[in-house]
Amino acid sequence: MRGEMSTSECRFAVRTHQLSKRYGEIEAVRHLDMNVPLGPISGFLGQNGAGKSTTLKMLMGAVRPSSGSGQIFGLNIADATQSVEIRKRAVFVSEDKRLYDYMTVEQIIRFTRSFFPKWRSDLEAKFLKHFPLPLDRRIKKLSKGMRTQLALLLGISRGAEMLVLDEPTEGLDPVAIETVLELLKSLAAEGMTILFSSHQVAEVEQIANYVFMIDRGELVVSSSVDRLKNGYRRLVAVFDTPVNGKDLAMGGVKRIGIAGAMVTLTVERDSERIIEHLRSLRARTIDVLPVTLKEIFLQNVGAK
């Protein structure tokens, strides 16, 4: 697995061991070992259908694992009593954003507030300032984006220690997405642990400190964002004549692009050795460039 974190690095809010979920013959999640650090923002990246939602639902007690184990704040996710305690300390905003359609926005805010003694009225007010939801409108008449905003308001305001968000920006316009991401950053700065799933790499790169990538039910990347990006480089070499791609295939080279006499390599670690190889092939110039999280995602997931 790429960039796996040492268990001695930090404390963890979430830990899983071989966590798996099978639906008939389909393995939705397979042998997941995932350690989510306590405190910062963690992004959970994967394509649609990769297993993100199933994983989060298992963590929050909405789906029972087929095998393996998991803990949140040291509490067993498969134990009914401990799962109740988990839901007191961690809030789950699911992808389907289920709400009571017959209520108005104001009614469901008031209704939800009554169940949570640690309700953050300051966050409620802050959220409504950024997203002036129509308080007298019934939920069934809200747009998809407004339903997402309302679900986030109800989750964020509960005063929990941790937010578990499944596709929290789904249905939002670019301005609203930016506002939500900035709000999540401010909550993390207060010490709240945030784990959110997304298939939008740019959102994860913008705010996440740690990233987990899942591909067809398997965890393929687990790392801090900075460490992961520092482990990759893009090398752009210009030759006097075209180069044979076979001469560029070597350990550490993850992707090769050739356009005439210009070669672009995506490399993982040990870039100096590969640079020396390019020089031995008589490269006229070699530029070393950073790699985006999107490129790393495509290398580990999308390119398969």
What do these predicted ranges mean?
Residues R2-T7, T266-K304:
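C-terminal coupling/interaction segments
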Residues R11-T16, K21-F196, V201-D215, V221:
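ABC transporter nucleotide-binding domains
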Residues S20, E106, V201, P242, ...:
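Alpha-helix N-cap/helix-start and coil->helix boundary motif
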Residues T104, S224, L289-T292:
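Short loop/turn segments at beta->alpha junctions
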Residues F116, Y232, V301-K304:
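Conserved NTP-handling cores and scaffolds of large molecular machines
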Residues E167, F239, P290:
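Residues that line or immediately flank small-molecule/substrate-binding pockets and catalytic motifs
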Residues T179-R269:
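ABC transporter nucleotide-binding domain
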